[in-house]
Amino acid sequence: MMKKITVFLFLAVSLFFTSCKSSVSVKPSAVGADFDVSISFGSAFCGLFSAVFPSEEGGETRSFFDDAQITQMLTATGIQNVRVKSNGQTSLQISGSAAASGNPLVDSGIIVFAPDGNVSLVFSFQNLQALYGLLPFELASYIDMLMAPAFTGEEMTDGEYIDSVATVYGKNVADELNDGEVKFNIHGTDARTNSSSLSAVKLLNVIGTVRFCGKRAGEND
């Protein structure tokens, strides 16, 4: 029986090879920060992984994901309260909690806690490189599949990056990546939500620092 896709391959690839239906929500909690990642997969992504993980004998359709395995592997990284729900080959939802230290999301500087209790997501070349360095070898190896400048350190334009993806994975996958967008919902301590979107390519080829905050710009502590 062929292995189902592991959480490592999912984390490295699936969030970005999608249609425009990915979202990330983060809010302060007693643990530190609760997060929820919701992903709907595009047809090119599904086709790519159907080729890598073909149907078993008898032609029965099976899920790309093993919910229990994903839960176990995320828990092993220091993420708490992990919950995973997949829907065959079309969608995946993962939620969990990140404490103030002891997990790659916080230790890399991607999740940042403010003195007032609000939470931010911060993406830069430096902290994505830090995240890469904190991950186990297997996960880092799958991240290499993205060929993302933010992880490889190679300087290239967004167009050059898309072209390189098309060369390796095909035009349809590259087009989905180019059209992909991630919506970020950052919930503040005052129960208000700041929502912003960023293209997948701008995230994988990040320049400078991109910050999504739980407090609106200009608000005082």
Briefly describe each language-model feature range.
Residues 2-3, 178:
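Position-driven detector of the extreme protein N-terminus
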Residues 3-10:
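Sec-dependent signal peptide recognition
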Residues 16-19:
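C-terminal motif of bacterial Sec signal peptides marking the signal peptidase cleavage site
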Residues 22-26, 31-39, 96, 119-121:
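One face of beta-strands
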Residues 30-35, 40-49, 101-103, 191-192:
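Primarily extracytoplasmic ectodomains and periplasmic/lumenal surface modules that are beta-strand-rich
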Residues 41-72, 135-138:
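Post-signal-peptide N-terminal segment of Sec-exported extracytoplasmic proteins
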Residues 75-221:
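Mature, soluble, non-transmembrane domains
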